[in-house]
Amino acid sequence: MRASSLFAESVFTTSAAAGRRRCPRLAAVPVTLFFSTGRGSPAMAEEAQQPRGVKVGGIHDAPAGRENDLTTVELARFAVAEHNSKANAMLELERVVKVRQQVVGGFMHYLTVEVKEPGGANKLYEAKVWERAWENFKQLQDFKPLDDATA
């Protein structure tokens, strides 16, 4: 009798000895165990090294075209409006230039925005907005001009 069959018999005999019904059909099924040698095809190794999905905690560029997405533009408007109310400023959003994101109990959005200053000059700012959409929560974390960045 093979070792795997002995294992199956001992499991079912022990179960029967414990007062449970014995399943004769399963006792006859040999148990096969597969052991991995840790080796695989080169394609499997390469696939294992490829990043999957979003890295939690890492800041990454948003997919192309996200700058014109309605949700992103609304976040940028929110950031400019919050900054204006806190700093008593009169900036106007012109466009979203770049979007980066970070997963942190929601999303931290890093928005590079072009704004028009009261004098008429356009300038680039970096806005950092924390959003938890499922709670309808968003908060401006930071809003600062990019050094020597005139659009």
UniProtKB/Swiss-Prot annotation:
It holds the Pfam family SQAPI. A motif (Secondary area of contact) lies at residues 102-106. GO terms for biological process: defense response. Keywords: Plant defense, Protease inhibitor, Thiol protease inhibitor. GO terms for molecular function: cysteine-type endopeptidase inhibitor activity. Residues 57-147 form the Cystatin domain. The record marks 57 as: Reactive site. Coiled coil: none annotated. There are two distinct cystatins in rice seeds (Oryzacystatin-1 and -2) with different specificities against cysteine proteinases. May be involved in the control of germination by inhibition of endogenous cysteine proteinases. May play a role in defense by inhibiting exogenous proteases such as those present in digestive tracks of insects and nematodes. Belongs to the cystatin family. Phytocystatin subfamily. This is Cysteine proteinase inhibitor 2. The lineage of its organism: Eukaryota, Viridiplantae, Streptophyta, Embryophyta, Tracheophyta.
